Amino acid sequence: SAASDVYKRQGFSIVLVKDISLLDGCKIGHFNFIKCPCLKMSESAMIGNLNFIRGNFSLELREESMIYMQNKITSSGYSFHDVTFVLGKYASIQVAHLFDVTDNIKIGDNTLFAGVGTQVWTHSFYLEDSGKGRHRIDGSVSIGNNVNISSRCIICCGVKIADSIIIGANSCISKDLKSKGLYVNQELRFIEFDPAEKMSSMICQKSIGKLNIYKK
């Protein structure tokens, strides 16, 4: 049966999924917690051990991709469209990385999250100049093919990274990377920034009490 077939491919893990598809050779290891509406794993895809995956998003692992160990993939409580986390063919997420899937995350083929401790964010907040006002900004993250991301990087909301890029350790990526090559962090510098002006070009998706949620 389909249930027994899934059981043969799963170690000692908790998997709470409404729609699940596991193709030949894929595997879920031990001590994972997975709770999401949809899980699709293509041929020889793997979820290793001790991963925590929970949220209102669909998870798709393409051929021979891997989420290895101790990674955390979650979403915030509110999303306003169908959200998907896609891991491309032969792509690999190694150890103890964090992904916020409030909006879509797409990771290209043969892309590597190396080392430990990288964070990928698909939402952020703008605070008003005074008072209690704060506004959530959602933005999908797209990472191309053959991208190598080193330990403890931060990839911010709405960023797009082109193919064949290397990102050095401890880098903060707050804007699109369009040309292939090596990127490393720079010295701290001041940038003029007005949240109100920035939000004026965005669409407010919803207001919850005093919190307005915008789409980047």
PLM regions and their residue ranges:
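Extracellular beta-sheet-rich ligand-binding/adhesion modules
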Residues: 8-16
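Short, small-residue-biased leader/transition segments that mark boundaries at the very start
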Residues: 1-7
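Flexible, glycine/small-residue-enriched loop-and-beta-strand segment within the central core
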Residues: 17-22, 26-159, 187, 194-195
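Charged, low-complexity C-terminal accessory regions
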Residues: 197-216
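C-terminal/domain-terminus segments
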Residues: 161-184
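Short linear motifs in intrinsically disordered
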Residues: 4, 63, 109, 172-173
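Conserved acidic donor-binding loop of glycosyltransferase catalytic domains
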Residues: 120-121, 168, 174-175, 191-193
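Conserved beta-strand-loop-alpha-helix hinge in the C-terminal portion
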Residues: 179-202
